[in-house]
């Protein structure tokens, strides 16, 4: 397959580029925390555009293959982490912070699932929730209250406010209508 692609390498790289780009767009929409994959993709494309000799083309193709493989693995990460959906993993990624204990990580996983469930249930009750200040405030308060009640004590006031904002922005972009 690689050798066949190398003969028509320009076309093959363009095809692979298009597939990776589409996959990245879906993944970033589902989980904005995956931006590092997009950054890696841009590095590969920039290197390819800088110099197009045969060695660069071969390296670019191999880099794109490797990136595509890691994207496939990332798309299955929610299963490895014990979640039932990529959405739950997205909330977890937004709440995750370095230096958490194993127990705190388990708590964050539970909070992620619980918070997403509560948000979806609340949004389902609200008519065009993103259109009115009152309904936006209901969702924002739900996020704030859940984080205050359920996050580990290692999260301070500043952390909770930061995570509240991140989760709200994610929900606002991801669930403009009934979830």
What is each model feature region?
Residues 17, 30-179:
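C-terminal amphipathic alpha-helical interaction region
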Residues 23-27:
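Short, charge/polar-rich alpha-helical segments
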């Amino acid at each position: 397959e690689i050798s066949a692609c190398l003969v028509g390498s320009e076309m093959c790289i363009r095809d692979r580029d298009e597939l990776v780009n589409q996959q990245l767009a879906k993944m970033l929409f589902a989980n904005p925390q995956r931006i590092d994959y997009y950054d890696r993709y841009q590095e590969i494309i920039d290197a390819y555009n800088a110099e197009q000799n045969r060695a660069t083309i071969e390296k670019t193709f191999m880099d794109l293959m490797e990136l595509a493989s890691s994207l496939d693995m990332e798309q299955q990460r929610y299963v490895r982490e014990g979640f039932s959906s990529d959405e739950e993993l997205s909330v977890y990624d937004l709440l995750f912070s370095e230096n958490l204990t194993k127990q705190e990580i388990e708590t964050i996983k539970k909070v992620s699932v619980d918070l997403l469930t509560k948000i979806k249930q609340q949004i389902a009750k609200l008519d065009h929730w993103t259109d009115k200040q009152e309904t936006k405030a209901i969702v924002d308060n739900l996020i704030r209250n859940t984080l205050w009640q359920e996050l580990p004590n290692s999260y301070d006031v500043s952390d909770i406010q930061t995570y509240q904002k991140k989760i709200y922005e994610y929900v606002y972009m991801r669930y403009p209508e009934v979830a």
